[in-house]
């Protein structure tokens, strides 16, 4: 009798793991990691220029008025998709400071030449140190920073046309 029971044990284990896998596949998952830095001041940073066309970026650049901080990269396909919306925000008077992640100067310049340049400054974060310090987990991500340098809002993923009013409203709230 004991030997027969052991013959069924592999089948029972397989059924258990198959059931567990099936259950996990039916559960909702959160694909976005929200920053724990919302409501906190930007960490101190001073990044060199991402290319020769614009100055670098630092925490001091966020004083005075609300601004957008856009985390992006030339190798990021969703960053191409959001380029027209960033241009639209710039056309409405929004100052956008960029941080290019793990990028080369020539690639940054080429990207901006092809898709437009909505940025007043772009810092080069070659090892993603600042990106991680502000709680960004990917590219693109955009943060609303208030006039005192406090992170007020995080937009995860590329900015779509339908997201522009929300970002403008968050900038207004950050006054």
What spans do the regions from the language model cover?
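N-terminal targeting signals for export/organelle localization
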Residues: 1-48, 175
């Amino acid at each position: 009798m004991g030997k027969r029971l052991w013959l069924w044990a592999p089948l029972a284990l397989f059924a258990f793991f198959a059931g567990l896998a099936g259950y996990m596949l039916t559960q909702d998952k959160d694909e976005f990691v929200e920053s724990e830095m919302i409501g906190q001041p930007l960490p101190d940073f001073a990044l060199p220029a991402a290319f020769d066309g614009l100055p670098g970026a630092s925490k001091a650049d966020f004083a005075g008025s609300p601004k957008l901080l856009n985390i992006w990269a030339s190798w990021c396909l969703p960053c191409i998709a959001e380029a027209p919306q960033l241009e639209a925000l710039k056309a409405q008077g929004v100052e956008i400071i960029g941080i290019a992640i793990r990028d080369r100067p020539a690639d940054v310049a080429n990207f901006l030449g092809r898709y437009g340049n909505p940025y007043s400054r772009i810092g080069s974060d070659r090892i993603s140190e600042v990106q991680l310090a502000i709680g960004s987990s990917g590219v693109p991500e955009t943060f609303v920073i208030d006039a005192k340098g406090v992170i007020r809002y995080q937009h995860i993923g590329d900015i779509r046309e339908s997201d522009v009013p929300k970002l403008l409203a968050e900038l207004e709230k950050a006054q």
